[in-house]
Amino acid sequence: MLYIKPLPSFFLTAMDRTPHRRQRISQTERVENTQRKLIDAALQLLHEEGFKGATLQAIARKAQVSLGALQHHFKTRDALMERLVQEIMEPLSAQGSIWPDRALPLPERAHDFVQRAWKNVFCTPHYQAAWSLFLGCKPSSALFAHINAQRVQVDHGFYAQFLQTFPEITDHHPHPQGVAITVFAAFRGAGVLELFDVTTTEREAFLGTLADTIAQAGQIAST
C-alpha cells in the first residue's frame, strides 16, 4: 500500500498566509493620482523657484514622471497653471473648508471663520505660490486673462458666501458688500506678507482684529 507522507504543519500554515492578489487600481484612480503628483510638484516649484522655474520639464522631474506623461494630462503649461488656480481657490467655494457653522454666536463664528480661512488658504505655501503664478504670468495675455476671469468669479462667490455666513452684516451694516471686499483684501495682503518674516505677535494681532471687525460689522450700531 502506497503511503503518502502528510505535509508539515508549518508548510500548510505558510500556504494559508499567502497574500491575496493586490486590488487593481482603476484607470480613473491612476489618472487622479498622477494629476495630484503633477499639481503638487508644480505648486512646490512655484513656491521655491518662482514662475520661471516652474517649467514643464522641471515639473515632470519633480513629479518623477516623463514629460510625455505630463503632457498627456496637461497639454500645455497654461492648462496646468489654470488647474493650479482652481486647486488653490477651492477652499473659498461654497463647499469649501473655511466656512463655520452658521448656528454659532456671531463673535465665535467670526473667530472660527478667520482661523479657518487663514489656516486652510491664506497662510499656506500654496497661496504664496499662487502669487508667483499671478505675477509671473502677466506677460502671457491669454493665461493672465483666464486667471483674472477666475479671480472675478472666486471673488464674487466669496462675497456672496461670506454674507450668507454672516447675515447680520447685511441686516445691520450700511455697506455689507464693502465689508466682504475689505475682509478678502485684508486676507490677501496678509497672505502675501507671509513671504517675509512676520512675527507671531503681528500675525495674531491681525487675525484677532479682523475677527473683531467682522463681529462689529454685524452688530446694531449704537445711536
Over which residues does each language-model region extend?
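C-terminal peripheral helix-coil segments that are non-catalytic and often amphipathic
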Residues: 1-22, 155-164, 181-223
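Short, well-structured alpha-helical segments
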Residues: 111, 173-184
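Basic, helix-initiating cap at the start of DNA-binding domains
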Residues: 2-49, 56-62, 79-82
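Short hydrophobic/aromatic patch on the recognition helix
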Residues: 63-74
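Amphipathic alpha-helical packing segments from all-alpha helical-bundle domains
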Residues: 93, 97-98, 123-129, 141-167, ...
